[in-house]
Amino acid sequence: MSIEKQKVVRKIKKKSFDVEHMNRLNQFELDQWQKEMQNVIRENTITFVDSFASTGKTFCALHYAAQQYLADPTCTITVVRTPVEAGDDKIGALPGDASTSMEGKLGVHFTSTKAILSDLLGAGRVACDEGKRIFFTIPNFVLGATIDGILIADETQMLSPLTMKLILERIGAGGKCIILGASGQLYEDSKKRNGLRDAMKRFFNEDGSKKYEKIGRYSFPLEAVKRDDVVRDVITAYGIG
């Protein structure tokens, strides 16, 4: 087979492969609020989503990123999560290299993010492109980097304001940044200020309106919570979100 024919065959196989994965992605239906969230993401360079737990905001952000990843072969997905420990259990330093220690400290949160993306794109695709077009990392490891693709920062209520600033400054030309969190979802008393709450005050007016053209926000209503109805009562009782 000639070189030109080989190129054509590879191109056809790749197109078929991408169509297969796009069909897989299209099997996942978004609810009305998740569709609204994605519309806000499309309209802005930076989108803040400060909402209750269990509204599907992480899934929705990864779903959007997966669409762009399949549509553009140059698009990258970078997921940033903080290794800050929550609650009273302090596990300290962990053995292993940076990757294993990071996964250990982030525990189920880091694993669940990978699992969602694996459901959307296929575990094989994620494993193949991890470290190439798909990255799971912590704030310290993006210091000095320029991220031109989709940058998703999750659980950002656990960040300090300066760490939030570090993440927001990574956005490259044509990139998008999606900031996820629940500013009231804190499980320990910290001397550091809530980075998400601080950012919301900096970038938006008291009535929620924009201060900057390319920076938007979205909040899910309480009825969007997908866990048992009693969780809504818990959120209401604590007066947080």
Set out the residue ranges of the language-model regions.
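Conserved helicase motor core of SF1/SF2 NTP-dependent helicases
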Residues: S2-N26, Q32-A153, Q157-G241
